[in-house]
């Protein structure tokens, strides 16, 4: 699409730019003093937030108005704040969007600490399939709270799991019945996972992508949380050498579609003979493993079992656990953050517009929120790639099947741009 040349928007003097060391400085001061500093910038090639030099400073004169944004964040006072002209481009999960097109409740991308190792993320995935849960942070802060809870008889198992998350701040409490609960500090990196799993009907939803991400550690935690094992034979006789038994895992807390997806995943990915059936007077849905599938599954998860849970293994698979906590240094990553408020900022003494040009990536962060390196003047011609507006965000959330045949998709559609805007 053809367009005329355009000068992108700017920031109010007091908007604070995030510097390379994590501190902030007012953009007006950076520009007026032509400060030779590095700022944090997102590198799309490496998918990392990196330090970059400022290579140009701009004071673009008075603005008619600024929009004041308040965005949720996990640390400090729980809020990021900045003021931008309505045409300044701000990064959202759907792409670059003009500030004037954003409303309260929309989400932008912000830099937040990323604390979990790959192993710890698997602990979360497995626990969500079992007794763990993620609850939203109710104080208008970014991040969700991961919680684990087990009865008194499983206290040792809970301690084992908590040790795997040992570098994450947490509190432990016990109720009158002796059950213990561990609440971890809210983690922004789990917010999208919480939105994907809890669809609003009270049951947990696990997509095909979720199941494909599971490692044997996650499967082991799911089994230890919700699985039962009935030992049929200890293997003392020659015909039952090695022992035999059957696994049953309760899946009542999952949506009906998820139960079928999980059964098919175990069959197709791991070659396990499993079926769904109702059990007990309450008619709860369980996944039942054949004796051959039980042995195959237990061999897969044995190296990842907690010592206190090895009674759920055949005798020949016990004593194989090799799990040790794996922690990583915190890094800054992009996560969606909700806009808590946006309004026209009252006129101040300085209404001048300020901006900077950043080496290479052409973006920077204002109080943690990603914005475009705006003073890039274009001369017309073809519309820039990032300037194309996405109006509907369509995501597949479930494949509908008739037996084994895929017959359709269940999709979630979100209007991500609802005003007339270029192009």
Swiss-Prot record:
Concerning CDD domains, the annotation shows: Hint
Q: Which Pfam families match?
A: LAGLIDADG_2, RecA
Keywords, ordered alphabetically: ATP-binding, Autocatalytic cleavage, Cytoplasm, DNA damage, DNA recombination, DNA repair, DNA-binding, Nucleotide-binding, Protein splicing, SOS response
A molecular-function term among this protein's GO annotations = ATP-dependent activity, acting on DNA
InterPro entries, per the entry: DNA_recomb/repair_RecA (IPR013765), DNA_recomb/repair_RecA_CS (IPR020584), Hint_dom_C (IPR003586), Hint_dom_N (IPR003587), Hint_dom_sf (IPR036844), Homing_endonucl (IPR027434), INTEIN (IPR006142), Intein_C (IPR030934)
Instruction: State the disulfide connectivity.
Output: none
Q: State the superkingdom.
A: Bacteria
Spell out the subcellular localization from the entry.
Cytoplasm
Q: Posttranslational modification, per the record? A: This protein undergoes a protein self splicing that involves a post-translational excision of the intervening region (intein) followed by peptide ligation.
Q: What Gene Ontology cellular-component terms does the record carry?
A: cytosol
UniProt GO BP = DNA recombination; DNA repair; intein-mediated protein splicing; SOS response
Family membership: Belongs to the RecA family.
NCBIfam families assigned:
intein_Cterm, intein_Nterm
- Job of this protein: Can catalyze the hydrolysis of ATP in the presence of single-stranded DNA, the ATP-dependent uptake of single-stranded DNA by duplex DNA, and the ATP-dependent hybridization of homologous single-stranded DNAs. It interacts with LexA causing its activation and leading to its autocatalytic cleavage.
Q: What is this protein called?
A: Protein RecA
The organism is Mycobacterium shimoidei
